[in-house]
Structure formats: structure tokens, C-alpha cells
Swiss-Prot record:
The organism's taxonomic lineage, starting at the top: Bacteria, Pseudomonadati, Pseudomonadota, Alphaproteobacteria, Hyphomicrobiales
Main location: membrane
Residues with lipidation of kind S-diacylglycerol cysteine: C26
Protein name according to UniProt: Flagellar L-ring protein
Compartments where located: Cell outer membrane; Bacterial flagellum basal body
Record carries keyword Lipoprotein: yes
Record-linked NCBIfam families: PRK00249.1-5 (NF001305)
MF annotations from Gene Ontology: cytoskeletal motor activity
Superkingdom classification of source: Bacteria
Record PANTHER family: FLAGELLAR L-RING PROTEIN (PTHR34933:SF1)
Membrane topology, record value: Lipid-anchor
Amino acid sequence: MSKSVPLQRIVLVAALMATGGLAGGCSSIDRLAAIGERPALTPIENPTTQPGYKPVQMPMPKPEVASYNANSLWRNGSRAFFKDQRAAKVGDILTVTVNFTDKANIANETQRSRTSKEDSGITDFIGSKTITTPATAVLPGRILTTDSTSSSDGKGSVQRQEALQTNVAAVVTQVLPNGNLVVEGKQEIRVNFEIRELIVAGIVRPEDIQSDNTIDSSKIAQARIAYGGRGQITDVQQPRYGQQVMDVLLPF
């Protein structure tokens, strides 16, 4: 039995290493092939042809048929008398001003304590006090005694402060039936061996687009803003595959 325990441990470790190797095998091969080279920028592609792209579907009002009046320059349903150069059609470009500042402080403290004690016994059962036989030995005055104490003390706090200020150009990928625009923009900046990526997507109203063809990120509905990177610095900040596998499998 003493020899089988180390063998079981070896098998378990080997299985974990194999799992981690399979999980990151393809990624590791690509990283080995790119040693000493700068991370490559992704090619410019049509966002609607990317894997996983899904058109946005939102509740829409009933369509209204535009009518024209004789000798009138105004069309019913028009939102402006003169045409401007702001983004309005699929393929048009507008600038998104990302101005994000978030700060949160949360503190929780919980204390709980409980003490319970119970005694149970038989002092007299069918004249057991008058009977002097060995049977009286099984009828003690105290049969069961329980005593329990439990306590819980928990503290938690969250302190978070984030800020992001930048501009990114976005492309109109879809025009909804009510006139709202679905936009998506991606920006990549490479500095030495690190690439910083900024992705902005969401739904905007044409009325919220300013005269200089810009819009603030706070006016984007269903906004999806992602800011991250990839490269040598990001690799150092990420835990190794083996550690990630152990964190998932180990229950303690």
C-alpha cells in the first residue's frame, strides 16, 4: 500500500499536466514560433463577417409610410431640413469619445454567535430508586447532555477606481428600422512588443451625434467597451496554464 500511494500521485500529476498541455497546446506552439518577434497586428476586416457576429434585434415601432405634399420641400418623418455629413448609413464612420471614470468603495462586516446547551435524563422510572439491583445502573439521572457553540466573523471590502479617456473611430454596421445606428470600432496600437486593443460597440441615436461627427460613449446604448492587450507584458501578468488548471480542479 505504501508503494501504491506515490504511484497514484504520479498518475494524478501526469494527468493534470496532460490536461494543461492540451488546453494550451495550440497557443503554446504559436507563441514558440513567434519568439523574438513583435506581436502581429490583426488585419482590417469587415466586422459583419467575423465569426460569432450577430445582427442586433431591438423592439421597433410600426413603420410609417412617408408622404409628400404638393409644392412642399418638407417630407413627413424627416428629422432635419438640410442634409448634414454626420454618419447615417452603413459604412459611414464616426468618432467615439470614450470618457470613463468609475470609483466604488464597499465595506461589509458580519458577526454571528450562537450558544446552545441541553440536558436530558431520568430521575425515577417505575420505582427505580427503591430497586437495588444491577438494573438501576442503566438508569442514571443524566442520560444525554449536549453543548454546542458556533460563531462567525466575516469582513469584506472593495476599493476600485478606473479611468479611461481616448477616442476611437467606429463604423456603422447596421441601421435599425427606427433609424438608430449599430456601430463598432476597433483600434490596435503596438508599442515595442506589446499591443493595446480598444473595442467599442453599441447602439447610438443619430440625434446624439454632434455636428463634428463625434459622440460620447455615455450616450451609447448597450455599450460594449473593452480595453486590453497582448504581448510580453500581458504574458507575464497571466498565470501559467498548469496553475489555471489546478485552480479549476482543486476544490480547496
